[in-house]
Swiss-Prot record:
It comes from Burkholderia multivorans (strain ATCC 17616 / 249). This is Acetyl-coenzyme A carboxylase carboxyl transferase subunit alpha. PANTHER family: ACETYL-COENZYME A CARBOXYLASE CARBOXYL TRANSFERASE SUBUNIT ALPHA, ACETYL-COENZYME A CARBOXYLASE CARBOXYL TRANSFERASE SUBUNIT ALPHA, CHLOROPLASTIC. NCBIfam families: accA, AccA_sub, PRK05724.1. Component of the acetyl coenzyme A carboxylase (ACC) complex. First, biotin carboxylase catalyzes the carboxylation of biotin on its carrier protein (BCCP) and then the CO(2) group is transferred by the carboxyltransferase to acetyl-CoA to form malonyl-CoA. One of its GO terms (molecular function) is acetyl-CoA carboxylase activity. It is found in: Cytoplasm.
Amino acid sequence: MKTTFLDFEQPIAELEAKIEELRFVQDDSAVDISEEIERLSKKSQQLTKDLYANLTPWQVSQIARHPQRPYTLDYVAELFTDFHELHGDRAFADDLSIVGGLARFGGHPCMVIGHQKGRDTKERAARNFGMPRPEGYRKAERLMRLAEKFGLPIFTFVDTPGAYPGIGAEERGQSEAIGRNLYVMAELKTPIITTVIGEGGSGGALAIAVADTVMMLQFSTYSVISPEGCASILWKSAAKAPEAAEALGLTAHRLKALGLIDKIINEPLGGAHRDPKGMAALLRRALADSLRQFQGMSIDALRERRFERLMAYGKFKETTPGA
C-alpha cells in the first residue's frame, strides 16, 4: 500500500517520490543510479528522524489519526492466536465499534477488547468511525465479567475520538454505560492491561482503560476532549486546534511526566503505520512484560494496587481564604 503523507511530511513525500521515480528509471535503463537512490534514501531517513524528533502536540494528534495506522484487529492478528470474536451486549445490539473476544497470548488464554475504526467508507460507517454507543460499552462489560469468571487476563486497546454523542445513544444511557464500566473495571478480580494505540478520546476511551497498567504508543494521544473541540469552546474556532493541543498536554511524554500513564512504547521511524509488523513486535514485548508483572499476584493485592493507582491521580492543595 502506498504511504499517505500528512501535510507536515511533504518534504519527506517529495523525496520519496523522487526515489520512486529513480527506481522506475533504473528498471528501464542500463545506467546504474543505485548510488543516487541510496543517497536519497539516507537523506529521507535522516529528514524523517529530524522531523519526528521535534513534533508539536498537534502533529502528534495527526499521526494518531493517520488512516493507515494499525487498528485493534490488526494487532490481534499479529499478537494473538485462536481469536474468537464475541458479539452483542445481550440487551440491545452488537456495536461494531467495539470488538472483543477470547484469544491466546503467548499460548495462554486471555480476553481482548478494543475500539475498531474502518479502512474504507463502508466499514467506517458500519463501525461508526470508532465511536461506541452504549451497547458497545455494555458488550465490553459483558466480556470483562466473562474474563473475571474464568480468571483470564484482559488486554484492552484504545483508539477512539470519543463516545458517540447521538440522541439515540443518550436515550439508551451512554453516560450510565461508561460510568458502569469505570466501576466494574476498578473492581475486577483479574489483571487488566491497557494500551492506547491511536486516539484516546475522553470518557469514550476511559471506559475500557481503567487498568493495572496503562501504556501509550509513542505517537498516540489521550485527552479529555479533541483539540478541535477544545478550540471551538475556548476560542470559538477550530482553527485554534494547534494551540489547544499544546494546552491539553495530550502526548504520551506529557502524560508520563504527570504520572497518568505507566509506560511509553516507542514506534518505528515515521510512526506505526510505516512498519506495522515492527510495531507489533515492540508491542508484544511490552504486553508480555506487563503481564509477567501481575502473574502470581494475589487478587487482593492486585485490586489494592489498582485502587491506590487510581487514588494517586491528580493533585490538590488546600488553602485558607484570605491566607
